[in-house]
Each structure stands twice: as C-alpha cells, then as structure tokens.
A protein has these predicted regions:
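Rossmann-fold NAD(P)-binding glycine/threonine-rich loop
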Residues: 94-107, 116-143, 148-158
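Conserved active-site and cofactor/substrate-binding residues in soluble primary-metabolism enzymes
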Residues: 7, 11, 15, 35, ...
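Substrate-binding/catalytic subdomain of NAD(P)-dependent oxidoreductase enzymes
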Residues: 183-184, 191-262
Length: 262
C-alpha cells in the first residue's frame, strides 16, 4: 500500500486530483500497488485520513473539513503512517516545504516534486538533498519541474547515462513569457496581459518569478545539473522585466504599481 500526500491544491494540484481520480484503479491494476490518497495540504490547513480520501471530492471536503495544523503535528502524523511507503507530492512553489526535503528523506518518505526550489538551490544544498535520498534508498523525482510534464529531465539523464556529452541545451523555457510575447501587439497594456495570464494560471503564483527570469533560471540550473554540470544559480545571467519599485511587496502591490512594464 502506497500512501500519497498532496501538498498544494492550486491549478496543478486540482488538476492532479482530477487525473488521479480517473486513473487510480487503472494505476493500481497496472502496478500491483494500492495507491491511497492520505492527505491534501495547503499553506494553512490539512485534510488527512489514513483510510484514504476520495480524490474526486477531496477539494469539496477540504473546504468544509480541513483543519489548521502546525508543521510539527503534520510531520508526526506523516511519520506514524500505516503504509508500506509514503510519497510526498510537492506541487507548490514553497521554499518552506522544499527546506523539509532532508527531513522527508531521513524519515523514509519519497518525494515527487514540481517545486523547482530544491533542484535549483545552491550546489551544496542540492548535493546534500540528493545524497540524503540516495543514502536512505528513497526516490526524489522532479521531472515535472521542467517541460510541463514532458520527459525532458529523463531524456537528458538517459543521454548522460549512455555516455553522451551534452554541449548545449536550447528551447523555450518559459511558457508564460512565450504566451505574453505572442499576445502582445501594443493594443492591450502589457500589465493587463500579465493579469490575464495570472488569472488563467499560466504564471507562477507570483508572476514576478516569471517576469524576473527566476523561473527560467531555475529550469536551466536543473537541466544543467542533469547534464552533468556543477553550476550555481548565480552563474546564470538574468535580465529582469520587473520594475525596481515592484520587486518587493505583495502581488497586489505589483499589479497596482506595474505601469512601467507598459
């Protein structure tokens, strides 16, 4: 029996719940494992049940039944799980959650991550996390960090494992910026297009992560490391589109004061 805990119930998390609800039976039949959705967690509240949650109704139940839970009590609940293995699904953009990967590894949890922060952290921290999962025999899988779910990371790793040397990687590494510049023709203020993309879930929770180039930088660091290069995030040259007076503060502050983008 494999227990699953989903961290993040935004665009990616809600779509994953739809997919899991549809594929749960097929997945179990194909693999021979019983997959149980044990919890859904956001930044403030948790909905947890060792017996399992109905993925198709988890969000509705979450709104009515989720409770506020501190990090320590949640971790204790996870450590007491009754399953053969516990898998953490991190579909957040949370640095706080990424900082817990070492603890997850040390307590025998697997991690599947769409969160780029751990994979694009400093080299020393990245190696520390990677080694922790290696030593405990747990999996840290992060193919979902680059390429919108396409097996880009796997392809790069397979080439390296086959003895190839990767000299360069090229591509469009930001679906957000690609969409924005495709739409922009001067008739609609650029900030309005950014707002549209944000409302449609095409950006990071904070669109400044896309506009600053940080999102692309993180993807490049992750891919470069998969290709065998020892690289630090600050070695990637980034030119930000975010006006200096909008770099700090809330997302609302950014939208209210982002006229310079136009």
């Amino acid at each position: 029996r494999i227990g699953l805990i989903l961290f993040g119930k935004g665009n990616i998390g809600s779509r994953w719940l739809e997919l899991f609800a549809r594929e749960q039976t097929t997945l179990s039949a194909r693999t021979g494992f019983e997959f149980i959705l044990a919890g859904v967690v956001d930044s403030r509240r948790s909905l947890l049940n060792y017996e399992g949650l109905d993925a198709s109704r988890a969000l509705a139940f979450f709104n009515d039944e989720a409770v506020e839970q501190d990090e320590e009590s949640l971790f204790l609940w996870m450590r007491a799980h009754p399953y053969d293995d516990l898998v953490v699904l991190d579909v957040t953009a949370s640095e706080q959650l990424a900082d817990q990967y070492l603890d997850f590894a040390s307590h025998g949890f697997h991690v599947i991550s769409a969160n780029k922060l751990a994979g694009a952290s400093s080299s020393s921290k990245y190696r520390q996390i990677h080694d922790a999962f290696e030593k405990t025999g747990r999996h840290w899988l992060y193919n979902a960090t680059v390429g919108a779910g396409l097996p880009v990371n796997h392809t790069v790793r397979d080439l390296i494992d086959s003895g190839d040397t990767i000299l360069a990687l090229s591509g469009i590494f930001s679906g957000t910026l690609s969409w924005l510049f495709l739409q922009f023709d001067g008739t609609v203020p650029f900030t309005d297009l950014v707002d549209q993309a944000w409302q449609q879930g095409l950006t990071e929770p904070d669109p400044r992560v896309d506009l600053s180039g940080k999102d692309v930088m993180r993807k490049l660091v992750i891919l470069a490391r998969e290709a065998g290069y020892d690289i630090e995030p600050d070695q990637v040259r980034v030119e930000s589109l975010v006006p200096a007076h909008c770099e700090e503060g809330s997302v609302d502050h950014f939208f209210e004061n982002g006229e310079a983008l136009n």
